[in-house]
Regions:
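Short alpha-helical interface patches
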Residues: 42, 48, 59-112, 207-217, ...
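Short secondary-structure boundary/capping segments
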Residues: 176-177, 200-203, 441-445, 469-474, ...
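P-loop NTPase motor domains
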Residues: 130-423, 438, 442, 498, ...
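A broad, low-specificity signal for short, low-complexity segments enriched in glycine/proline
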Residues: 93-101, 112, 116-126, 146-147, ...
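Basic- and hydrophobic-enriched, low-structure N-terminal and domain-boundary segments
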Residues: 1-142, 146-151, 193, 484-485, ...
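Short loop or secondary-structure boundary microenvironments that flank
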Residues: 357, 361, 401, 429, ...
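Conserved ATP-driven motor cores of ASCE-family P-loop NTPases powering translocation/secretion/packaging/pilus
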Residues: 415-517
Length: 598
């Protein structure tokens, strides 16, 4: 806009040369008569504006007038001021809720992502040229679940991946989602016997996926803030794990490709510190594989691991066993032995995948970290290789308790490429400090990649300052008063303007719990009420509207169940059973009976 104004001014200045020359030629015949002659002659010349007479002073007069004109233009430019009345110290102000909502929403209510009571945004990113990546920040009790997560689940308009501490979202909205035609799948790390199974090995398409799985596993099982002075042990342990996984991937039957089998192989790799020549069953296994295929990738990694002394090998095994020790638990071993989640299907039909984690124990969160990484890989691959770059069903990650799960170091890059593939995330945090702790160098990039930022309130000073600076400064009018006393006292009032934050950090801290502050890229900030869940049209199908709670893992929701039917009804009664009337059945006998009635 500034360049356009400069071009317009230049054009006017050039055009102004024409009347200057014309006027100079009118004045030229009177130049020799002095100032009085010019003053007397100009009115007469103006009566006949087109009667121009050339004379000996014409050229000199034109040059004098052009020089004066040029000097005038120069003085004008040098003294020109650029005023923005009322915006001298800043132009920040609150956005118009209705106008902004009208610009970004779909007319059909359930086609939108809900942000505040009166603002929603369409998932059709081509409509408004914004991504639907959202950062939600709110302290405990600010309503991150009630005012944001639940309302968007109740929309039932995308596939969902929900990190659900305590299982509250699943219990309250699972029945609604099933009624809306969703397949509900649950990775339950609280009550694992009720969980669908998840086997990361199923989603390994190539050797790079194996490498990423091992890298992510080691990162996710590293305690926060810990730094190893000697990375040798982790590097060597990762080589051993790569060897075991590659062996299972290429040599074992499909039902043995899982982490429980990795633990079996690790236990078979006995090392005797006093006997470097001892060969364990695991050594013999890889020796046979080397004889069969010396260039096998599993053999290469195993030989790299096995190049040390027996004492070193023992330490490496202990390091790896420490990383994988959770898989010794029968509950986790059973959960990861097979797979029921079918991750790619989330991009093809409406599926709600809930990952339930304890809110007071992070022991098993590493499995959710692996799940996230593989979900991104699977969905991106599906979009690129089957659907021309865009999934047929949008997938929305609701990342509650975002700070409790380890994510890839390049998560900011993942954010930047997911939009085009119909994948979005909502990063839910308690404060900005959590994001800075997770991504010390990339946190600003993550915030910048998200076009929406919703602040629900909190009590962390760094977040207050960040929100205040994001709101910007406004220009306000101020008065100053002066009064002097004495024999000739006087009273004065001065009017001036100054800059002031739209909300100071203290005012951000004091934000009414009914309200939220919402930012969308390229728009004025919005102050609006939080979404009232009881006014959602689908609330009657949730527990908040007295609907049925969703109970996963019940008999009627089992993946497979066995019924003996009515054939035995009435045959057995308490009176007919004596101690000598029954016997314990072997597994073979039990299987034969089951096959008879199934």
């Amino acid at each position: 806009m500034k360049n356009d104004d400069e071009q317009s001014s230049l054009m006017v200045a050039v055009i102004g040369i024409i009347p200057v020359i014309w006027f100079a030629l009118l004045v030229a015949p009177y130049l020799s008569s002095g100032l009085m002659g010019i003053l007397d002659g100009v009115p007469e010349a103006m009566n006949h504006p087109f009667s121009i007479r050339l004379c000996g002073d014409s050229v000199k007069t034109v040059l004098i007038f052009l020089l004066s004109y040029g000097m005038g233009i120069g003085i004008y430019i040098s003294t020109k001021k650029h005023y923005r009345r009322g915006e001298e110290h800043g132009s920040a102000k609150w956005g118009n809720v209705k106008k902004i909502n009208r610009r970004y929403r779909e007319k059909r209510f359930t086609k939108n992502k809900l942000l505040t009571m009166h603002v929603r945004i369409s998932y059709n990113m081509r409509k408004h040229l914004r991504n639907v990546l959202t950062v939600v920040i709110g302290g405990s009790g600010s309503g991150k679940t009630r005012f944001f997560a639940k309302p968007n689940l109740m929309q039932a308009n995308t596939s969902f991946v929900v990190l659900d501490p305590k299982g509250e979202n699943l219990r309250d909205t699972g029945y609604l989602l099933e009624e809306k035609g969703y397949e509900v799948r649950v990775l339950d790390l609280i009550n694992m016997e009720k969980s669908h199974c998840y086997n990361p090995f199923v989603y390994l398409k190539d050797d790079n996926d194996v490498q990423r799985l091992v890298t992510n596993l080691f990162k996710a099982t590293t305690p926060k803030g810990s730094q190893s002075n000697d990375p040798f042990w982790d590097t060597a342990a990762s080589m051993l794990l790569l060897a075991l996984i590659f062996y299972l991937r290429y040599e074992a039957p499909e039902e043995e490709q899982n982490f429980p089998m990795v633990m079996e192989m690790l236990r078979a790799g006995e090392v005797r510190e006093d006997d470097d020549q001892y060969q364990s069953p695991l050594d013999e296994l890889f020796e046979r594989l080397e004889m069969k295929n010396p260039e096998h990738i599993a053999v290469k990694y195993y030989k790299d691991y096995h190049s040390g002394s027996a004492k070193t090998l023992k330490s490496i095994q202990i390091t790896l066993a420490t990383r994988l020790e959770k898989f010794n638990l029968s509950s986790l071993a059973a959960l990861t032995a097979t797979d029921d989640l079918d991750l790619p299907s989330l991009g093809e039909r409406k599926v709600a995948l809930f990952a339930l984690i304890p809110d007071n124990d992070t022991s098993y969160n590493f499995l959710v970290s692996i799940l996230y990484t593989q979900l991104f890989q699977q969905l991106f691959y599906l979009a690129d290789h089957k659907y021309g770059g865009r999934l047929p069903v949008h997938v929305h990650f609701l990342m509650d308790e975002f700070a409790n799960v380890s994510l890839p170091d390049d998560f900011d890059k993942i954010l930047s490429v997911m939009r085009s593939r119909e994948v979005s995330v909502s990063i839910i945090l308690q404060n900005l400090a959590q994001l800075k702790a997770l991504f010390e160098k990339q946190w600003e990039s993550i915030m910048g990649n998200c076009d929406e930022f919703l602040y629900l309130g909190g009590n962390e000073q760094g977040t207050h300052k960040y929100v205040s600076e994001l709101l910007g400064k406004a220009t306000i009018d101020t008065n100053t008063y002066g009064k002097s006393t004495g024999h000739s006292g006087n009273y004065s009032t001065n009017y001036q303007n100054t800059g002031r934050e739209l909300m100071t950090p203290d005012e951000v801290r004091m934000l009414d719990n009914r309200y939220a502050i919402f930012f969308i890229r390229g728009e004025r900030p919005i102050l609006d009420e939080k979404f009232d869940i009881l006014k959602h049209p689908n609330v009657g199908l949730t527990t908040d509207g007295n609907g049925k709670p969703y109970l996963h893992g019940a008999v009627d929701r089992a993946v497979a169940s066995i019924s003996l039917g009515d054939s035995l009804e009435g045959e057995l009664t308490d009176d007919s059973l004596e101690s000598e009337d029954y016997e314990l059945l072997s597994d073979e006998d039990l299987e034969e009976i089951i096959q008879k009635y199934v």
